[in-house]
Amino acid sequence: MTMTDPLGDMLTRIRNGASRRKSSVSTPASKLRARVLDVLQSEGYIRGYSVVDFGNGKSELNIELKYYEGASVIREIGRVSKPGRRVYVSVKSIPQVANGLGITILSTPKGVMADHQAREQNVGGEVLCSVF
C-alpha cells in the first residue's frame, strides 16, 4: 500500500510517540524527512536521529524524542501544507506559531529551514509544518 503523505505520517509518529512517552520512534527514511529532522534537532525539539540501512535499498530513521521534567518538549506538531492543499507563502507572510514561541518549517529554494532562517535569508516557500 502506498502512503499519500509520508511527512504527515512521520509527524503523526512523533506526536503519538511523545504522547505515549516513548524514548524513540522509527519511520521509513527519505531526504525530506531527514531535512525536517535536521531542523527539529537544531531547534531543540528532538535529541537526534540515526539512519538504519537494511541493505536492500530500504532504510529507516530512528528518532530520539526529547523530554524536559517528564513532559515532551513538543507540545503540538502538525502538517500545514497537505498533498491535496499546498500552502505557499512569501517572506512577508510567513506565519508565526504561538507568537514566536514555536516554529514553522518551510521548504524553500534554499532548502528546508525554520521560519526565522527564511526571514533572515529573505525567502518564502511551502509551509510544511508547525511545531510548538
Curated annotation (Swiss-Prot):
Supply the alphabetized keyword list. Ribonucleoprotein, Ribosomal protein, RNA-binding, rRNA-binding
- Record GO terms (molecular function): rRNA binding; structural constituent of ribosome
- Assembly description: Part of the 30S ribosomal subunit. Contacts proteins S5 and S12.
What is stated as this protein's family in its record? Answer: Belongs to the universal ribosomal protein uS8 family.
PANTHER family the UniProt entry points to: 40S RIBOSOMAL PROTEIN S15A
What Pfam family is a match, any one? Answer: Ribosomal_S8
| Top-rank taxon | Bacteria
Q: Does the keyword Ribosomal protein apply?
A: yes
Q: Please, one GO biological process term?
A: translation
Record's protein name:
Small ribosomal subunit protein uS8
Q: Which HAMAP family match?
A: Ribosomal_uS8_B (MF_01302_B)
**GO cellular component, as recorded:** ribonucleoprotein complex; ribosome
Question: What role does it play?
Answer: One of the primary rRNA binding proteins, it binds directly to 16S rRNA central domain where it helps coordinate assembly of the platform of the 30S subunit.
